[in-house]
Regions:
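Thiamine diphosphate
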Residues: 1-171, 174-327
Length: 327
């Protein structure tokens, strides 16, 4: 095992897959000469050249359309968005073309494309650069959505995404690119659609994903000091959702709290709560609670940002509520 940064894990995934498969290429704003806005593609231009590491104009709709067309014609594009907030401009290509082409062509055209980039809050970037989009895209049949929370998952999930024959959206985070973690020396894959029990416990289940896993795990450690043993599940994939792992945990702990950076209306937490009450209602000893971002555009002010986003204190309070520890 060796320690790498999250950005380095993504870089290794893309580089390994490009060496393995000449049909794989990377395109996006500043991915070549500048090594990527967050240095994820550092050194790749020198190794693979300008025909496979392609700087694009500032036109998300345009280069996403090129990517979809290339995928329909036998290539495996990786399209990098500087942020998923900018991908709103490319939503027509992602939702109406990449997601639907296999069905609309009667199975004639797969679209093996990866869309990836930073997602969610990232410091004081304010309302238009701080949105979480997992729930929006997970609502679209034909798309797969993954949210790696560690360098290990970032590399393994991205490699699986590149090899997938259907469109996969990889939701990263600007706040995680510098995070460090261990990965194996040899090749490995993390399967799409399989959650991970990041912390075993017996008293309550906490489900989260992406950078909110830091919040969930921090809350679990504080709860342990008070004698509450929380099990923490990292979804890793949002669509398809690994309901079985969640249900198995809830059957053991009988309580569930979901931590989700998306807005509360029609969120990932909403879907998890529905599936648990549908398939494990008789095992619940308390209502499912969820911790979401406040139902308002994210402010610029640091105190208001802190008040808007999920944090360990809010998770701890929710856990105590489902365990009836609140006086």
């Amino acid at each position: 095992m060796r320690t790498v940064q999250y950005r380095e894990a993504l870089n290794e995934a893309m580089s390994e897959e490009m060496r393995r498969d000449p049909s794989v290429f990377l395109m996006g704003e500043e991915v070549a000469e500048y090594d990527g806005a967050y240095k994820v593609s550092k050194g790749m231009l020198a190794e693979f050249g300008p025909k496979r590491i392609i700087d694009t104009p500032i036109s998300e709709l345009g280069f996403s359309a090129i990517g979809v067309g290339a995928a329909m014609n036998g290539l495996r594009p990786i399209v990098e968005f500087m942020t998923w907030n900018f991908a709103i401009l490319a939503a027509d290509q992602i939702i109406n073309h990449a997601a639907k082409m296999l069905q609309m062509s009667g199975g004639q055209f797969h679209v093996p494309i990866v869309f990836r980039g930073g997602n969610g809050s990232a410091g004081q970037l304010a309302a238009t650069h701080s949105q979480s989009f997992e729930a929006m895209y997970a609502n679209i049949p034909g798309l797969k959505v993954v949210t790696p929370s560690t360098p290990y998952d970032a590399k393994g999930l991205l490699k699986s995404a590149i090899r997938d024959d259907d469109p996969v959206l990889v939701m990263e985070s600007e706040r995680m690119y510098g995070d460090k973690g261990e990965i194996p020396d040899g090749e490995y894959l993390v399967p799409i659609g399989v959650a991970h029990v990041a912390r075993k416990g017996t008293d309550v289940t906490i489900v989260s994903f992406g950078k909110m896993m830091k919040v969930a795990l921090a809350a679990a450690e504080e709860l342990q000091k008070e004698g509450v043993n929380a099990e923490v599940i990292d979804l890793r994939t949002i669509r398809p959702l690994d309901t079985a792992t969640i249900i198995a945990s809830v059957r053991k702990t009988n309580r569930l709290v979901v931590v989700d950076e998306n807005f509360p209306m029609v969120s990932i937490a909403s879907e998890v709560a529905y599936r648990v009450q549908k398939d494990a209602f008789d095992f619940l000893d308390a209502p499912v609670l969820r911790i979401n971002q406040a139902d308002t555009p994210l402010p610029f002010s640091p105190p208001l940002i802190e008040a808007s986003l999920p944090n360990p204190a809010r998770v701890i309070a929710a856990v105590k509520e489902v365990m009836y520890l609140v006086k």
